[in-house]
Amino acid sequence: MANSPHGGVLKDLLARDSPRHAELSTEAETLPALLLSERQLCDLELLLNGGFSPLEGFMTEQDYNGVVKENRLASGALFSMPITLDVDQATIDELSLKAGARITLRDFRDDRNLAILTVEDVYKPDKALEAKEVFGGDEEHPAVQYLYKTAKDFYVGGKLEAVNRLQHYDFVELRYTPSELRAHFDKLGWAKVVAFQTRNPMHRAHRELTVRAARSHHANVLIHPVVGLTKPGDIDHFTRVRVYKALLPRYPNGMAVLGLLPLAMRMGGPREAIWHAIIRKNHGATHFIVGRDHAGPGKNSKGVDFYGPYDAQYAVEKYRDELGIEVVPFQMMTYLPDSDEYAPVDQIPQGVRTLNISGTELRARLRSGREIPEWFSYPEVVKVLRESHPPRSQQGFTIFLTGYQNSGKDQIARALQVTLNQQGGRSVSLFLGETVRHELSSELGFSREDRDKNIARIGFVASELTRSGAAVIAAPIAPFEQARQSARELVEKYGDFYLIHVATSLEYCEKTDKRGIYKKARAGEIKGFTGVDDPYEAPAKPNLVVDAETQSVRSIVHQIILLLESQGLLDRF
């Protein structure tokens, strides 16, 4: 029999409200509507299907404050993560959000009405307190960054009524709700279920870890990966799910089931481990594996861990009686080549030879095409990963040239395009500053905001082309560091980004200006001209610095080609 839900009752709002579906659907069409973001949709889905039981809606101020300060809802029930609906003042005014108001919550992807929210309160959270108490306060933490840079200033609390399930078009057969997963366990006759949380591909060590956990507790295994929002830079869930499906036959027949969890992770370490345990309990699991640095985001820019390696295990141990799910702490598994087996690191005698491949090393091997040994992963898993990670010679990249008007960046970009076309193997796209201004950003001016929008558009287009394996050459002025960095972050989701500072002096750019643009700017005929009456922020960390005053275009292009070659991007075989 599946474990009882957190709080004793599964708050399956979809099942509860299905008799009123026609009535609620009609009302939803008449109410003011709020389009939810991707993260809000993840939260809503687990609120509607009972994954966040005992919650029946987004947290009110009383619940929110209790969770932030004490891991407690107003009822006294244990809950460790704030589940909130953030809005801005304009939305409050537009939708007349106040206690008693009813609004429709809508999917931004297809305008589908999903739920009706009855507002209980609208409040301004103490974000600094939330950042400190829930996530540890480090400003580099992904969740803290989200709080300050993305989340709106106000939260809306209230109860939900379900109108429709969210529509999914991928791996639908694996997207079990808590009720469906519980029924599946009952059908299989499983009395004990060990749940395994992951946001990464699984390899031999993970298979060994989960089988050991099942063996020691006479249980079966629920592989329960997150397919909502995870850490930026993680391998996409499409690839990961194909990996899990490839791995499943490696378990003894009937031992393991794969189910997908549409969770938006916060990377909250100890707090998140408690939350994950509650979610798995609601899905019927009796046991939950908590490993080293569970749900931690790794290290900050100074190389300091956001959390201690076993903080998450200590946190769930503290609340184990209340959680009502047995936590299975596990050390990292490592390979012993002399005996051809895996073992937990804390059980390996001193002097025994071990081997391991880190996530960073694995990604490097995938990018370079180097061998991934069979002791580390199964051939069928590696095959899936390689399908999503082509060799370097087939990966896209972006060359982003920045510098003053008439610095030579356009000539360099054109010459580089010709050189790469001669090389072959990839399509090559060229985005010169004036071309982009004419074709993509004709309505934009030259205020800082408009300049940043222009670079954001270039970054978006470059990222999509990079993802599809193209070579992209962009040569805008791009005077501001933050906009350039944002473009880098967009592109680096899918491939390499190389920032080339064309550091030709302003004096030389002006002296050799045959079009007379600088002269017009000096005369006041052109306003907001970079280098004259608008600033240029030199790149802090360019990949390459060149100067068209002292170097020929040919030699600069050769330097860029050598840079690309050194990264394996121009290998033909």
UniProtKB/Swiss-Prot annotation:
Q: What is its EC number?
A: 2.7.7.4
User: Which reaction(s) does the protein catalyse, per the Swiss-Prot or TrEMBL entry?
Assistant: sulfate + ATP + H(+) = adenosine 5'-phosphosulfate + diphosphate
Q: Does the keyword Mitochondrion apply?
A: no
Q: Where is this region: Allosteric regulation domain?
A: 395-573
Name of the molecule in the record: Sulfate adenylyltransferase
Write down the Gene3D superfamilies for this protein, in alphabetical order.
HUPs, P-loop containing nucleotide triphosphate hydrolases, Sulfate adenylyltransferase
The residues the record assigns to binding sulfate are 197, 199, 295
**PANTHER family membership:** SULFATE ADENYLYLTRANSFERASE
Cite the entry's keywords alphabetically.
Allosteric enzyme, Amino-acid biosynthesis, ATP-binding, Cysteine biosynthesis, Cytoplasm, Methionine biosynthesis, Nucleotide-binding, Nucleotidyltransferase, Transferase
Please name the source species: Chaetomium globosum (strain ATCC 6205 / CBS 148.51 / DSM 1962 / NBRC 6347 / NRRL 1970) (Soil fungus)
Transferase listed as a keyword: yes
User: InterPro entries given for it?
Assistant: APS_kinase, ATP-Sase_PUA-like_dom, P-loop_NTPase, PUA-like_sf, Rossmann-like_a/b/a_fold, Sulf_adenylyltr_euk, Sulf_AdTrans/APS_kinase, Sulfurylase_cat_dom
GO molecular function per UniProt: adenylylsulfate kinase activity; ATP binding; sulfate adenylyltransferase (ATP) activity
Record note on domains = The adenylyl-sulfate kinase (APS kinase) is non-functional. It is involved in allosteric regulation by PAPS. PAPS binding induces a large rotational rearrangement of domains lowering the substrate affinity of the enzyme.
Which residue ranges does UniProt annotate as crossing the membrane? none
**Active site: residue positions:** 198-200
Q: Which GO terms are recorded in the biological process aspect for this UniProt protein? A: cysteine biosynthetic process; hydrogen sulfide biosynthetic process; methionine biosynthetic process; sulfate assimilation via adenylyl sulfate reduction; sulfate assimilation, phosphoadenylyl sulfate reduction by phosphoadenylyl-sulfate reductase (thioredoxin)
Q: Quick one: a GO cellular component term?
A: cytoplasm
User: Mind telling me which residues the site (Transition state stabilizer) is annotated on?
Assistant: 203, 206
Report residues binding ATP: 197-200, 291-294, 333
Give the region (Catalytic) as residue ranges: 170-394
Relate the assembly described in the record.
Homohexamer. Dimer of trimers.
Site feature Induces change in substrate recognition on ATP binding, where: 330
Q: Where in the cell is it found?
A: Cytoplasm
Q: How is its activity regulated?
A: Allosterically inhibited by 3'-phosphoadenosine 5'-phosphosulfate (PAPS).
